[in-house]
Each structure stands twice: as structure tokens, then as C-alpha cells.
Amino acid sequence: MDDKELIEYFKSQMKEDPDMASAVAAIRTLLEFLKRDKGETIQGLRANLTSAIETLCGVDSSVAVSSGGELFLRFISLTSLEYSDYSKCKKIMIERGELFLRRISLSRNKIADLCHTFIKDGATILTHAYSRVVLRVLEAAVAAKKRFSVYVTESQPDLSGKKMAKALCHLNVPVTVVLDAAVGYIMEKADLVIVGAEGVVENGGIINKIGTNQMAVCAKAQNKPFYAVAESFKFVRLFPLNQQDVPDKFKYKADTLKVAQTGQDLKEEHPWVDYTAPSLITLLFTDLGVLTPSAVSDELIKLYL
């Protein structure tokens, strides 16, 4: 499976199911790559998979694709030392890969079951941009016959908040789209804030769509709970202390980074994500359970060791 086939397969997965997270599509692609690989050694197979992950990160530069790919590789590689026979080892790796995929497919429902209980009847929720996990949580709250209303930021520059509002309208949830600049104004009307995350970093902070950080700062100033929801495959080995510590490969779209390689200055570009410090986050809801930001490092160590 060459780079062109790999990219085409990844894009076809995304097109088939628009509701699928890019990281899940990347893991499906890597599993298919593993099945088709014609390598003859475990070391060669690992090298090929690492190269495939780098190729996919070049197509979709989100944090989740990078962390999901790395966790997939670690999960399937745990068996490589147990078997000396290559064909048997590869078969076990494929089985473990399929198990990993099944596990992460159930993540959103687990998170929704944990988080929707924190939404009280009659609550007013503020959310940011479009998040599939947040949407699943709100679907679970609707299914539990809870009445609530939602404010969603329009989320420039792609207006993904309007997509979220449309999805909530289909659930018959009262929803109002507000300007990104109106977060401080609208915060006093909200009872709680729920946002998704593109990545959860080692100190318990999150990397998410630009504008998340200012929302968290406003929530903290007005003593409103700020909840983040994210699947465990988004746990990434990064330890940023400020916005500048977030690598450019996560801040900008893949196309922008390619243009930057020709010499264009990235200072002219707007970043797509920002970093929210753990001190601003009340709780993180993951498929591993409900975590305080300080507990994230323990879970991350378990995942990566």
C-alpha cells in the first residue's frame, strides 16, 4: 500500500461516514495498511506503520490523528516480543488492531453515559464550535427526557458552531448561535460549559478549536463549571505551558504547513487551535472515567507504557 493508496483510503473512510472522527478513520486506514503490508520482519512492519502515520498526519494535522496513530501502534506492538514466528505475530497484531478499533468505537457512548448526568433539568449550556462527542452527550440528555437550552459560539473562521446549532435543532433543543466575541457577555446566562477536545495533554490541559481558552477564562472568572469531553485516543504526549509551546504542526491546517515550507511566514496565518490550562478545567469526561485534570498524567502513563 503506497502513500497515494493510503491517502485515498483515508479520504474514502472520511467520506463514507462524515460522523467519524478523523482519528478513527486514520486507525481504520492503519489497520488496512497492516493487513496489506508485505514486509517480512516485525521491525520492518513497525517502520512501515510509523511512516504511514507520518503520511496521514501530513493529510490531517490534528492532534488526534497523531495521538491515535501512536496509541494504535503501541497497542498492537505489545505482542511483537511474545512470538518468534512472523506470520503468527502479524495475525495477533491484526486481531489486537481490530480490538482497539472496537474499543474506541464505543468511546462516545461511554462518555455520554457519564456526562449527561451532570446536566440538570432546565439547565442552560454554553458550548463551542462543533464537537461530535458534545453532541452525543446532549443526545443522551435528550433521551433522558431532560429539558435544557444551548448557546453555541459561531466559531470563526469555519463557522462550525452553525453546524452544531443545526444538529441541535434536529433534536428539538432550543439553541442560540452567539458571536465568538460575546462569550463574556453570555457566560452569566449559562449554568455550565461543555466543550470537546482535539487533544488532552500530559498536565491535564486540552488543545481544542481556537476560542476555547477564552471561554475557559470567562467561566473561571464567573465561577461556572467548565467540562471537557474527549476519547482516550486523544491523550497526547505533550506538555505545553503556554500557547507558544503547542507545535505548529497541530496549530495549522496541513495545507497551510505545506505552503509554509515554501518560505511563507506563519505569523500571517491564524491558528486553528489553542491550549487551555488544567487550572481552568473543572472535570474531564473520558471513556476511562471522569477525571480531574491532575489525574490525566496517571492515565496517560498507563496508555503509553
Curated annotation (Swiss-Prot):
N6-acetyllysine modified-residue sites: K35
GO (cellular component) term, any one: cytosol
GO molecular function annotation: guanyl-nucleotide exchange factor activity; translation initiation factor activity
Activity regulation description: Activated by the chemical integrated stress response (ISR) inhibitor ISRIB which stimulates guanine nucleotide exchange factor activity for both phosphorylated and unphosphorylated eIF2.
Gene3D superfamilies reported for this sequence: Translation initiation factor eif-2b, domain 2, Translation initiation factor eIF-2B, N-terminal domain
Source organism, top-level taxon: Eukaryota
SUPFAM superfamilies: NagB/RpiA/CoA transferase-like
Cellular localization per UniProt: Cytoplasm, Cytosol
InterPro entries for this protein: eIF2B_alpha/beta/delta, elF-2B_alpha_N, IF-2B-related, IF_2B-like_C, NagB/RpiA_transferase-like
Entry keyword set: Acetylation, Cytoplasm, Initiation factor, Protein biosynthesis
Biological process terms in GO annotation: cytoplasmic translational initiation; oligodendrocyte development; T cell receptor signaling pathway; translational initiation
Main location: cytoplasm
Quaternary structure and partners: Component of the translation initiation factor 2B (eIF2B) complex which is a heterodecamer of two sets of five different subunits: alpha, beta, gamma, delta and epsilon. Subunits alpha, beta and delta comprise a regulatory subcomplex and subunits epsilon and gamma comprise a catalytic subcomplex. Within the complex, the hexameric regulatory complex resides at the center, with the two heterodimeric catalytic subcomplexes bound on opposite sides.
Cited function: Acts as a component of the translation initiation factor 2B (eIF2B) complex, which catalyzes the exchange of GDP for GTP on eukaryotic initiation factor 2 (eIF2) gamma subunit. Its guanine nucleotide exchange factor activity is repressed when bound to eIF2 complex phosphorylated on the alpha subunit, thereby limiting the amount of methionyl-initiator methionine tRNA available to the ribosome and consequently global translation is repressed.
PANTHER family noted in UniProt: TRANSLATION INITIATION FACTOR EIF-2B SUBUNIT ALPHA
UniProt family annotation: Belongs to the eIF-2B alpha/beta/delta subunits family.
The protein's name in its UniProt record: Translation initiation factor eIF2B subunit alpha
Lineage: Eukaryota, Metazoa, Chordata, Craniata, Vertebrata
Gene it is expressed from: EIF2B1
